[in-house]
Design a protein with these regions (language model features):
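Short gly/ser-rich anion-binding loops that grip negatively charged ligand groups
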Residues: 37, 52, 66, 70, ...
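Active-site-proximal, Lys/Arg-enriched surface segment
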Residues: 68-165, 296-300
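Generic alpha-helix structural propensity
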Residues: 27, 39-43, 57-61, 71, ...
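Single, function-defining residue in the core of a domain
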Residues: 1-16, 20, 51, 92, ...
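Gly/serine-rich nucleotide phosphate-binding loop at the start of the catalytic core
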Residues: 1-67
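Short, surface-exposed loop/strand segments
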Residues: 52-56, 98, 215
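Gly/Ser/Thr-rich loops at beta-strand to alpha-helix junctions
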Residues: 38, 100-102, 215-220
């Protein structure tokens, strides 16, 4: 197998060997190294070319690795999950969210028009053609950056729109073929896909508590009413939600027992009620200290969570820069401050989406086959995970050698994924070039500037 990367990266790749047959594992090993070292557009043919993989296998073997080989994405996610457990706290923190990978072309399998949050505004929604991926990640901090939270994707699902009966285009022709759209029997919503992944992770560690973070799309009954016993949900609540007291324990009359008590004020009314005093505090949210006011109460949100009691927290920005908001947790042991602080851990997943798109070419592969489409993009998330794990285990010791000095950014104090990727590439180039004992001192001196230039371009 080609040793494209630094030797300290090999144990991480070997951990995935049980997930593959021997030929597929050799392809996985080669593709992982070539993908990390590749720069520019990352189509599969360019990955093969940049790693010179045609010297190792026929190029068709790497296409078949995604379209025909026998391996399962969830097995890779489980391997990553077990590699992460030594870094995790006793209570696991996870998050679910979706991201859009924009595509172009009539024959892209599973692509459709989806809402594009990056191009949309509050007034004008924008839709883009592409794939919508639902991702479940584990969130944690590493010892080399204890104040920073990282999102590690472990499970990924492709959301497929339901096949439309009619899709007219110009002059009565279809503008795009409906390739890979789900039938009525195959169709599942994004929350249903998220619940499937939550149950999978909960079954991997039934003895551990798992707290799942999600935005308002994942706060509905599709998830909150069907959570496994060891899973708690922290999410955002609409300000107009209908809230109720718990049902009385003793029925006051004959007939069916009540499922909910009397109607309470909704979160918007709670925020405007001057008789309920705000609790004022300062919390560490999104990497900085923020002053917040909040009101908290335990209620039923029957339309979403049924008879499960929730702890809701209505939040106000005392500076008036943000509108009032409301969050809830199914875990009644959490304080309001813990709920708000923990929910802020959801943001690193958005940073992860940005990194895989801009630094690893998440939107670049163009697939026309079902299995290749559902494997190639998630494969990039696992490349992201491997780089993070390598840096946490050994790469952080090499950070000073690979540090890129920016005169316009002297206050930089935390490491980014871009820094990790540069460190891995720099360590690889140094090992591959300078590990040759035949090189004399003069040749090493000549080659050193080229490695530094390559580091600056990485």
């Amino acid at each position: 197998m080609p040793d494209l990367l630094v030797r300290s990266f090999a144990p991480l790749l070997l951990a995935f060997q049980p997930c593959f047959t021997q030929p597929s594992f050799r392809s996985f090993w080669a593709l992982a190294g070539a993908w990390i070292l590749c720069s520019g557009r990352r189509s599969l043919t360019r990955i093969i070319q940049s790693g010179d993989l045609s010297q190792f296998k026929h190029f068709c073997s790497f296409h078949r690795f995604f379209s025909q080989a026998r391996w399962n994405l969830d097995d890779l996610g489980r391997c990553v999950f077990h590699l992460l457990l030594p870094f995790c706290s006793p209570i696991l923190i996870g998050a679910v969210d979706d991201t859009l990978a924009r595509k172009s072309g009539r024959h892209i399998w599973g692509a459709a028009m989806h809402h594009d949050p990056l191009r949309s505004s509050k007034i004008r929604p924008v839709f883009s053609f592409g794939h919508s991926w639902v991702v479940l990640s584990v969130h944690l901090s590493f010892s080399f950056a204890p104040n920073k939270v990282w999102a590690i994707p472990i499970l990924v699902r492709l959301y497929r729109k339901q096949k439309a009966k009619l899709a007219p285009g110009r002059n009565g022709k279809l503008e795009r073929k409906q390739t890979g759209h789900a039938t009525a029997q195959q169709y599942r919503t994004r929350p249903e896909l998220a619940l499937e992944m939550i149950r999978t992770v909960a079954n991997w560690v039934p003895e551990r508590k798992l707290r799942i973070l999600g935005d308002s799309e994942y706060a509905g009954g599709s998830i909150s009413r069907h959570l496994p016993a060891n899973v708690e949900l922290i999410s955002r609540m609409v300000m107009g939600a209908a809230l109720f007291e718990p049902a009385p324990t003793k029925p006051s009359r004959l007939g069916r027992p009540r499922k909910k008590g009397k109607r309470l004020a909704n979160p918007a009314q709670m925020a405007d009620n001057s008789k309920l005093r705000w609790t004022k505090t300062t919390l560490r949210l999104y990497g900085r200290s923020v002053k917040v006011w909040y009101k908290s109460i335990d209620v039923l949100w029957y339309s979403s969570a049924g008879q499960r009691l929730l702890r809701i927290v209505v939040v106000r920005d005392p500076r008036g820069h943000r509108r009032d908001d409301c969050f809830f947790s199914t875990d009644l042991t959490m304080t309001p401050s813990e709920i708000l602080t923990t929910f802020s851990w959801r943001w690193p997943l958005e940073v992860c989406f940005r990194d895989v798109k801009q630094l690893l070419g998440f939107e670049d592969p163009q697939n026309r086959v079902s299995s290749a489409t559902q494997r190639t993009a998630p494969f990039i998330f696992y490349i992201y995970d491997l780089v993070l794990l390598w840096y946490a285990q050994s790469g952080h010791r090499l950070a000073q050698q690979s540090l890129l000095q920016r005169l316009w950014y002297p206050q930089k104090a935390t490491v980014s994924f871009e820094d990790m990727l540069r460190t891995l590439r720099h360590a690889t180039w140094q090992e591959r070039i300078f590990s040759d004992p035949a090189l004399d001192a003069h040749t090493r001196k000549l080659l050193k500037p080229f490695v530094e230039w390559a580091k600056a371009m990485a």
